[in-house]
């Protein structure tokens, strides 16, 4: 291999961020869902990496957002899309906090009930769900008690 090939082989494919958030271990193919769920301002520098090798025969997605620290609400949204994601808070190119997302016991204001007769679809009431199971995901509407599974939640 020539010198340029050696440099390319040993270099990073994506620049590290100075300050912001890296969402790692996003389920393969879900990075755009996470990006869309976060409603990030258009002036932010964002890197989306999809189908990145991760361990033996596994792939993951990664989302890097410069200048953003996520709220608990945002982290809860991510947990519903990719329950094994990891959040890294970066300051001056150093990881100052790293944690795995967790599906909360109660989900409020993130989802709407799929029951057309539920009060959340008739009046201006935010959706509220109790988590009944995590693997696989199963949630119950607080108001009408309709169950939703992971397929309905991840749409």
Curated annotation (Swiss-Prot):
Classification via InterPro entries: Asp_carbamoyltransf_reg_N (IPR020545), Asp_carbamoylTrfase_reg (IPR002801), Asp_carbamoyltrfase_reg_C (IPR020542), Asp_carbatrfase_reg_C_sf (IPR036792), Asp_carbatrfase_reg_N_sf (IPR036793)
Cofactor binding remark: Binds 1 zinc ion per subunit.
The keyword S-adenosyl-L-methionine belongs to this UniProt entry's keyword annotation: no
Binding site for Zn(2+): 113, 118, 141, 144
Sample GO molecular function, one term: metal ion binding
Keyword Zinc: yes
One Gene Ontology CC term in the entry: aspartate carbamoyltransferase complex
Cofactors named for this entry: Zn(2+)
Coiled-coil features, chain-numbered ranges: none
Keywords for this protein: Metal-binding, Pyrimidine biosynthesis, Zinc
GO biological process, one term: 'de novo' pyrimidine nucleobase biosynthetic process
PANTHER family named in the record: ASPARTATE CARBAMOYLTRANSFERASE REGULATORY CHAIN (PTHR35805:SF1)
Function, in words: Involved in allosteric regulation of aspartate carbamoyltransferase.
Similarity comment: family membership: Belongs to the PyrI family.
Subunit structure: Contains catalytic and regulatory chains.
Protein name: Aspartate carbamoyltransferase regulatory chain
Organism this protein belongs to: Methanococcus aeolicus (strain ATCC BAA-1280 / DSM 17508 / OCM 812 / Nankai-3)
